[in-house]
Each structure stands twice: as C-alpha cells, then as structure tokens.
C-alpha cells in the first residue's frame, strides 16, 4: 500500500543497489521533514558518502576526493534542473488535494516523477563509471558483504521470515505512517481501509525480494567487469547506463515488469480511494504540507 504522493515517491526512489543509492542524492526532498529539508539537501553529497558509500566501499582518499567533486557537480545540476520539477509537482498536487482525485490523475503524477529518472541517470552515469574504474577487488568484496548485511536488515524490517499476517501488518503500519505524514491523524475507519487496501494490493514480497537480489548481483558484476576490464570511461559509462536502465526503468525480468505495472495501477486507485474518505481538515493539512515543501524546494533553487 502506497498512500498518495509519499508512497509514489518512495516507490520510485527506494532502491536496493549502489547505483540507486547514489541516485538518492537529490531525492532527500521526498524523505525529509520540512524543517530539515534545506540543511539535508545542501549537505547531500557529504551525507551520502558518509552514510552509504563509505560503509559499503571504504573509499581511499583519492576515490573520496574524486567522488566528492563529481557529486558536487551533479548536485548543482540537480538543484537547477530537477528541483523545479519537484516543486511544480507539489504545487500541482496542492491544487488537486481539496478535490476528489482519480487513480489516473495520481498515476500521471507518478509518471511525471518517473520521467525525472532518465536525465538523472544520464548525469549519474559518468560519476559512477569514474568510481567503478578505481574500485579494488577488496572493495567489491566489501560491497557484497554489506549487501548481505543490508538484506538481513531488510528481511527483519519486512518480517519476511514471519507469517503472512505479520508481513501484512508491516505494510499496514508503513501505509498509515505515510498517509499521516500528509493527512495528519487517520480515524479508525480510515486505518481499517488502509488495511483492506493492503490486503487487496497484490503485493508479492517474494517478487520484490527476487528483484532486490537481482539488482544487487547485477550491480556487483557490472562494477567488477568495469574495474577488471579498464576499457576507458566511454565504455564504462555505457555499461553503467545499461545498468541504470535495468535497475531503475526496465527490469530484464518480464514477469517483474508486468507486476510493477499492475501494482502501479492498484496503488493509484488505492490512493484515490483513501483520499475520498478524507475530511476537509485533513485535506487542508495536506495542502499546507505540500505548500511548505514547495516553498522549501523553491528556496533551494535560488
């Protein structure tokens, strides 16, 4: 269950490999509280290296210096080229929020955000390629080990080894948390609806888990191939571009692609259905929250 725009953004940008984590550089705006948004975004390159890249790769000083320089360039591009798109989306949803909304309307927002991934991945490709050319066997081994650790945490968070009822409850809890971020407190009937929508969502943990593992293995093998071949930046960038496409846009697993398309439609309809139950006060809360995000994002562009 992905309630409204928070879930749409999270579904787009919560990914499982090195590449998507790097792409999360400019997407802190979708995850931070308004009061922390500006500080978090302005420090995004350093925060990304500190919180994810170094724990997974343990960069040496030369790699760290190059990546920081590359991320600063990417960060500036993202600030000028993509933040205005996010601000426009928040503005658009703020206009829609007081009214009833349909599944197709919400899916159009999803598609608008998804479209930002193509130019973002194009800008990210040379950054990742330069880093990949410098990676050592020990760093790639460390990446695999950290993925194993991440996966244990993921299985624990989503209770993949527990009963179906406990897995469902995790989805419900996360759905309510996301919804209340935008609508404030839900009442009992709305929480019950979130639970029913989660039951009806056809979410398949095993499909998501399988794709997670595929992306991780694909990332490691691609980075290893680049590091070993040393065929230059142009070739390496092509390899990274193909990896980004497989990771973010078009999984090579046809069954998974069909599943994602189905889930998108279901989630959009679910979000519209939940929105229908909201009160005028809840919609006003959403409008105020959206406008606050929009204002902070536009301030970041200046």
Predicted regions and their residues:
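Short, structured motif recognition centered on aromatic/hydrophobic residues
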Residues: 53, 66-67, 121-135, 143, ...
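Bacterial signal peptide processing site
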Residues: 35-37
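Start-of-domain marker
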Residues: 39-78
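N-terminal secretory signal peptides that target proteins for export/translocation
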Residues: 1-17
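A cross-kingdom marker for long, charged
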Residues: 50-51, 209-302
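Mid-chain, structured segments of secreted extracytoplasmic proteins
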Residues: 80-119
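Extended amphipathic alpha-helical interaction segments
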Residues: 129-253
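C-terminal motif of bacterial Sec signal peptides marking the signal peptidase cleavage site
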Residues: 30-33
């Amino acid at each position: 269950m992905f309630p409204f725009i928070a879930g749409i953004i999270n579904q787009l940008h919560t990914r499982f490999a090195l590449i998507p984590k790097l792409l999360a550089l400019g997407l802190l705006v979708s995850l931070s509280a308004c009061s922390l948004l500006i500080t978090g975004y302005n420090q995004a390159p350093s925060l990304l290296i500190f919180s994810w890249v170094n724990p997974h790769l343990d960069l040496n000083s030369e790699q760290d210096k190059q990546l920081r320089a590359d991320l600063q360039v990417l960060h500036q591009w993202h600030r000028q080229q993509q933040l205005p798109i996010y601000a426009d989306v928040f503005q658009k949803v703020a206009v829609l929020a007081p009214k009833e909304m349909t599944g197709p309307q919400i899916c159009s927002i999803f598609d608008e955000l998804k479209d930002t991934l193509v130019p973002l991945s194009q800008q990210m490709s040379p950054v990742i390629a330069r880093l990949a050319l410098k990676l050592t066997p020990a760093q790639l081994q460390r990446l695999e080990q950290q993925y194993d650790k991440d996966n244990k945490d993921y299985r624990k968070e989503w209770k993949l080894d527990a009963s179906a009822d406990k897995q469902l409850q995790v989805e419900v809890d996360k759905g309510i948390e996301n919804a209340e971020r935008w609508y404030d407190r839900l009442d009992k009937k709305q929480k019950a609806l979130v639970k029913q929508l989660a039951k009806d969502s056809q979410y398949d943990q095993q499909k998501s888990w399988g794709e997670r593992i595929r992306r991780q293995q694909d990332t490691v093998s691609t980075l290893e191939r680049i590091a070993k071949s040393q065929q230059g930046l142009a070739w390496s960038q092509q390899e990274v571009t193909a990896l980004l496409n497989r990771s973010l846009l078009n999984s090579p697993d046809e069954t998974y692609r069909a599943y994602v398309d189905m889930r998108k439609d279901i989630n959009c309809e679910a979000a519209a259905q939940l929105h229908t139950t909201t009160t005028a006060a809840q919609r006003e809360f959403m409008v105020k929250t959206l406008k606050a995000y929009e204002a902070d994002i536009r301030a970041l562009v200046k």
